[in-house]
Amino acid sequence: MRRYLRVVGLCLACGFCSLLYAFSQLAVSLEEGAAVGRRPQAAVASWLADGGRGTGRGAGSAGPGRTGRCKEVSLSYWNPYWMLPSDVCGVNCFWEAAFRYGLKTRPTEKMHLAVVACGDRLEETVTMLKSALIFSIKPLHVHIFAEDQLHDSFKDRLDSWSFLQRFNYSLYPITFPSDSAMEWKKLFKPCASQRLFLPLILKGVDSLLYVDTDVLFLRPVDDIWSLLERFNSTQIAAMAPEHEEPRVGWYNRFARHPYYGRTGVNSGVMLMNMTRMRRKYFKNDMTTARLQWGDILMPLLKKYKLNITWGDQDLLNIMFYHNPESLFVFPCQWNYRPDHCIYGSNCREAEEEGVFILHGNRGVYHDDKQPAFRAMYEALRNCSLEDDSVRSLLKPLELELQKTVHTYCGKTYKIFIKQLAKSIRNRYDTPPKER
């Protein structure tokens, strides 16, 4: 008899619990019905507040498969052994997450590359861009500042690359402050000082990699772009030293103005956090007050224009001399120039890992003074963006480089192709799932 009474008592208790659960479900459904009735009005108000633009899913949207019952509450707060309350989503529960949620993916970061082209630099610029696109992985937006007569030529060449989905570009005229345009245009080379004004012109761009037209990428742009993550809280830009060996350095022997570090820095490859550059107040030797980027350039030029030789690069050296904490210095292999080999090899990092970015200044791509540099340039200039063309690039190039061993730079030709071979192998010979 007692056994039957226990069974009856257990049944009554279960029935009572079920009744309570049914009432709770009814209350929740009524509350949800009221909330659903309010949601369209809230969505319209949000849309109007945003100016009537279709901005996609708003903050109030439930997302894929997400119902109105969901709250941002961890499953671990609730009893996981039976079932979830009706107003809680199992965000941390694998069986609910697997069916109710898509993975939240961050939009792929876009890299920004800038170049300034004037005169006969069209072909050099196109070759540089080709080298950047061959290996890059993330989307690349190129900002091209060029003389007006070059714009149509750039459009003709670059529009033929429209099949590259991860590449787009913007063309800009050469632009200087109207009250001092002639002074800036005459500084060093035509248009060279344009790079100083990039943080002021590209106000919507957070970070930027500036390169000269005579630069060739031998590994993905992504890799130098990742150096931004290594900046500390005070650093706003990154460059390589002008020289590794002080005995052949220019700044430490001839400069008539302040310069950064032991041998100065070279601005042909310059990585910038432009948001920080625009915000920073720079120490200087013209006034006790610190000046922002847009305010310091002209006073700096007026004070030192009779003492500088390399134009805007000298001005950058002066600025970072007074603000050394703001500069991140990367190794010479990221800006490898003839100076690193014409007096004997003096870039240890390139000897160990190869050249990452080749910088053919001194016009070495177009004369016979440094045939190793010219061979690299011509190989990439003649290479198409087709995969087969890139794969077949290496062997003919190595044969050409072997012909240059009578020169100092040619003697170390293997460092020119060491990283290039690795980049080709990683980009084109690795199965997509392993990249």
UniProtKB/Swiss-Prot annotation:
CDD domains per the UniProt record, alphabetical: GT8_like_2 (cd06430)
Assigned EC number: 2.4.2.42
Membrane topology type: Single-pass type II membrane protein
Protein location: Membrane
One BP annotation, GO: O-glycan processing
Transmembrane segments: 7-29
Recorded GO MF terms: UDP-D-xylose:beta-D-glucoside alpha-1,3-D-xylosyltransferase activity; UDP-xylosyltransferase activity
Cytoplasmic compartment segments: 1-6
InterPro entries: Glyco_trans_8 (IPR002495), Glycosyltransferase_8 (IPR051993), Nucleotide-diphossugar_trans (IPR029044)
Matching Pfam families: Glyco_transf_8
Keywords linked to the UniProt accession: Glycoprotein, Glycosyltransferase, Membrane, Signal-anchor, Transferase, Transmembrane, Transmembrane helix
Enzyme class: transferase
Record topology, Lumenal segments: 30-435
Catalytic activity: 3-O-(beta-D-glucosyl)-L-seryl-[EGF-like domain protein] + UDP-alpha-D-xylose = 3-O-[alpha-D-xylosyl-(1->3)-beta-D-glucosyl]-L-seryl-[EGF-like domain protein] + UDP + H(+)
Record SUPFAM superfamilies: Nucleotide-diphospho-sugar transferases
Reported induction: By E2F1.
Positions annotated as glycosylated: N168, N232
Annotated Gene Ontology cellular component terms: membrane
Assigned protein family: Belongs to the glycosyltransferase 8 family.
Function of the molecule: Glycosyltransferase which elongates the O-linked glucose attached to EGF-like repeats in the extracellular domain of Notch proteins by catalyzing the addition of xylose.
Protein name according to UniProt: Glucoside xylosyltransferase 1
The organism of origin for this protein: Rattus norvegicus
Lineage: Eukaryota, Metazoa, Chordata, Craniata, Vertebrata
Gene label: Gxylt1
